[in-house]
Curated annotation (Swiss-Prot):
Entry keyword Amino-acid biosynthesis: no
Organism: Gloeothece citriformis (strain PCC 7424)
Protein name in UniProt: Aspartyl/glutamyl-tRNA(Asn/Gln) amidotransferase subunit C
Subunit architecture: Heterotrimer of A, B and C subunits.
Annotated transmembrane regions: none
Family: Belongs to the GatC family.
Entry keywords, A to Z: ATP-binding, Ligase, Nucleotide-binding, Protein biosynthesis
Catalytic activity annotation: L-glutamyl-tRNA(Gln) + L-glutamine + ATP + H2O = L-glutaminyl-tRNA(Gln) + L-glutamate + ADP + phosphate + H(+); L-aspartyl-tRNA(Asn) + L-glutamine + ATP + H2O = L-asparaginyl-tRNA(Asn) + L-glutamate + ADP + phosphate + 2 H(+)
Nucleotide-binding found in the keyword field: yes
Molecular function terms from GO: asparaginyl-tRNA synthase (glutamine-hydrolyzing) activity; ATP binding; glutaminyl-tRNA synthase (glutamine-hydrolyzing) activity
Length: 98
């Protein structure tokens, strides 16, 4: 189905350097993959509607709910830097006026 020359060309286009052993290995692997696609193309899909997924899925998310943290002090202890009762974070916006 695919020969070593085609594998060499694919490797060249992908800018891959492969050994002769890898050429043989990839020739066999790519031939198997292409044979599988041939088998799939023989399936009768006339009554199968086009789809992008095999199963219908939806984005399942949980609702957000606020819950108080048991200990504010313990939470602040975990911060790399703090200022009073707040986390101190690096400044990301330039506040210098020009």
């Amino acid at each position: 189905m695919i020969d070593t020359e085609q594998v060499k060309k694919i490797a060249h286009l992908a800018r891959l350097e492969i050994t002769p052993e890898q050429e043989e290995q990839f020739t066999g692997q790519l031939s198997s993959i292409l044979e599988y696609f041939d088998q799939l193309s023989e399936l009768d899909t006339t009554d199968v509607p086009p789809t992008t997924r095999a199963i219908e899925i939806k984005n399942i998310t949980r609702s957000d709910s606020m819950q108080p943290y048991p200990s504010r002090e313990e939470l602040l202890k975990e911060a790399p830097e703090q200022e009073g009762d707040f986390f101190k974070v690096p400044q990301i916006l330039n506040t210098d006026e020009e």
